[in-house]
A protein has these predicted regions:
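Active-site rim/adjacent substrate-binding subdomains
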Residues: 1-96, 108-135
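Catalytic glutamate of the conserved HExxH
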Residues: 100, 104-108
Length: 135
């Protein structure tokens, strides 16, 4: 997670909750929040950033809680889907989890993958985060 946060100047002490669930729980979340009745690999839930805000310093736009901590949001990963994707991509499960965690954090920082250009940008940033995490 730190490898994703560093290039985006996320303030020290900013928190992200990372949760792992099974496919059934992920399907329920995906249906409830995205109206898609199937499992998915990762979902992110965070405070709404102002329109057009993404990337460097995006987290600084969020107000700290009473404890002074900025809670960037929650990232939920389907453990089973991560394992399937790791096998398909022929890389370790730890790399897939790092990629999915980075992907989730990027969403919390205002990035989107609904367009081709947004998808390519997030894919490149996610791969960069995994490479940084390996060093």
């Amino acid at each position: 997670m730190q490898a994703t946060a560093e290039p985006f100047r996320v303030p020290p002490g900013t928190e992200v909750t990372l949760a792992f669930v099974d496919d059934d729980a992920m399907r329920v979340l995906n249906h409830r929040y995205r109206r898609k009745d199937k499992t998915t690999d990762v979902l992110s839930f965070g405070d709404e950033l102002p329109p057009g805000v993404k990337g460097p310093d995006a987290a600084r736009r969020l107000a700290p809680g009473p404890d002074g901590v900025i809670h960037l949001g929650d990232v939920v990963i389907s453990a089973a889907q991560a394992a399937r994707q790791a096998r398909k991509r022929h890389w370790p499960l730890s790399s897939e989890v790092a990629f999915l965690a980075a992907h989730g954090v990027l969403h919390l920082l205002g990035y989107e993958d609904e367009t081709d250009s947004g998808y390519r940008e997030m894919l490149a940033l996610g791969r960069k985060a995994v490479a940084s995490a390996r060093q």
